Amino acid sequence: MTGWQTYSERYPMLTAALAHAKRSDRMSHAYLVITSNPDFRTDFPLLLAALRVCENQRPDGGPCMECGECRQILNGIYPDFHILAPTSRAREIVIGKDSGDPDTLRWFESQFHLSSVSVSGWKIGVIQEADTMNESAQNAFLKTLEEPPGKCLFV
């Protein structure tokens, strides 16, 4: 995975703005990542998540990548990290019948209304290929973005 230092060198304005937002406790509850770079699409949401939950920020404002929360994010074992990606044959994200319907928007959203079990209390959600959401899923997620549950980060 590409680290914070590499992103700081490649995208200094972006990382400086995010680090400042974290230091001043003004990080947004949602970030939209648009890129054709597959590594950026994979790595950057993890770095954002680590920045949000990090217990020991670096002097430059980035995540330490060594505390318990950062290690859990990097190792893919952070208990409140959820990914939604298109899985149907049509390659679209659908709303689903109810919260018990896995890999649907209703299931994904239901994960953020449960109590957090992580030390930081933050819940992280990543929607991969958000442009594949069908119209009903888009409308449902828009409501969540307008009125987000507490201590949630969506990428």
Language-model features and meaning:
Residues M1-S136:
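Clamp-loader machinery-focused feature within the broader ASCE/P-loop NTPase space
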Residues H113-S116, N139-V155:
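Conserved catalytic/switch belt of AAA+ P-loop NTPases
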